[in-house]
């Protein structure tokens, strides 16, 4: 009796091992990965084979399991890609938003550039630097010597300053001291002045201590004082300051004076 019991136990153990070798997986659990989102056909799965009672070899079973696992991995990858694409499109991050801001590629105009452009225009229109081949050079030199003799000048007048002020007093409408028409040419003269002009007009001690902007202001003030004296002198002595133009106010003053001198002769 005892021997039959041992034989039964041995048969059960052998049968259990045989079943395990045939299918190491637990067939009681459902194949969730096989019944997939992509709608895979479950008739090719090992579970279906066992349910239908079909006989199959171990090699065939391994082939079927590998096929099922590979298809499931592809399906999951495709589903993951679709979900990721959907989430990106909903979130608005699928495309990098293009910036609508327009970048101005043209260089900004600096103050130095504007000043340089303005200076070039002023120099073209008002630069009175006397050239050696200027046909009016003798006239300019003569008027320069005349202006140097005017008393009370704030500093020794340069030839350039004399030429600029000579043109100012001989305009069709003469520039009176302190007016806007007077300020503009003197301001242009100050803007294109060189360091030597400051040295000629300003005190050396003041130039060592004062900043450049203060030196410009002081020089501009001295130009105003100088022109006021030139204006007074030329209207008192028009023949010494005229440029012999009929439109010159000084020339008109000379003609008026000559007419007044001739009137008594006609009366007699």
UniProtKB/Swiss-Prot annotation:
Domain notes: The RxLR-dEER motif acts to carry the protein into the host cell cytoplasm through binding to cell surface phosphatidylinositol-3-phosphate.
Biased composition (Polar residues): 107-123
Domain of life: Eukaryota
Disulfide bonds: none
Keyword set includes ATP-binding: no
Location in or out of the cell: Secreted; Host nucleus; Host cytoplasm
Residue positions of motif RxLR-dEER: 48-63
Keyword presence, Signal: yes
GO cellular component labels: extracellular region; host cell cytoplasm; host cell nucleus
Gene: RXLR6
Family membership: Belongs to the RxLR effector family.
Entry protein name: Secreted RxLR effector protein 6
Signal peptide: 1-19
Keywords: Host cytoplasm, Host nucleus, Secreted, Signal, Virulence
Main location: secreted
Residue span of region Disordered: 90-123
Role played: Secreted effector that completely suppresses the host cell death induced by cell death-inducing proteins.
């Amino acid at each position: 009796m005892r021997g039959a019991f041992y034989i039964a136990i041995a048969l059960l153990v052998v049968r259990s091992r045989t079943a395990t070798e045939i299918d190491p997986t637990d067939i009681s659990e459902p194949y969730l990965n096989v019944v997939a989102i992509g709608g895979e056909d479950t008739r090719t799965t090992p579970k279906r084979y066992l349910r239908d009672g079909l006989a199959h070899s171990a090699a065939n079973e391994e082939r079927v399991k590998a096929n099922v696992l590979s298809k499931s991995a592809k399906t999951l990858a495709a589903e993951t890609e679709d979900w990721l694409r959907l989430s990106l499109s909903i979130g608005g991050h699928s495309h990098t938003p293009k910036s609508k801001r327009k970048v101005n590629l043209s260089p900004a105009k600096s103050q130095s550039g504007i000043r340089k452009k303005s200076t070039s225009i002023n120099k073209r229109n008002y630069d009175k630097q006397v050239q050696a081949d200027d046909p009016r050079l003798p006239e300019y030199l003569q008027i320069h010597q005349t202006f140097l003799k005017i008393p009370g000048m704030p500093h020794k007048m340069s030839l350039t300053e004399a030429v600029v002020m000579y043109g100012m007093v001989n305009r069709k409408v003469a520039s009176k001291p302190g007016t806007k028409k007077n300020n503009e040419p003197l301001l242009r003269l100050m803007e294109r002045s060189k360091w030597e002009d400051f040295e000629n007009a300003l005190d050396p001690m003041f130039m060592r201590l004062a900043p450049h902007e203060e030196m410009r202001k002081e020089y501009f003030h001295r130009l105003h004082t100088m022109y006021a004296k030139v204006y007074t002198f030329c209207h008192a002595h028009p023949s010494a300051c005229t440029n012999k133009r009929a439109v010159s106010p000084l020339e008109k003053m000379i003609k008026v004076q000559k007419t007044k001198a001739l009137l008594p002769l006609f009366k007699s």
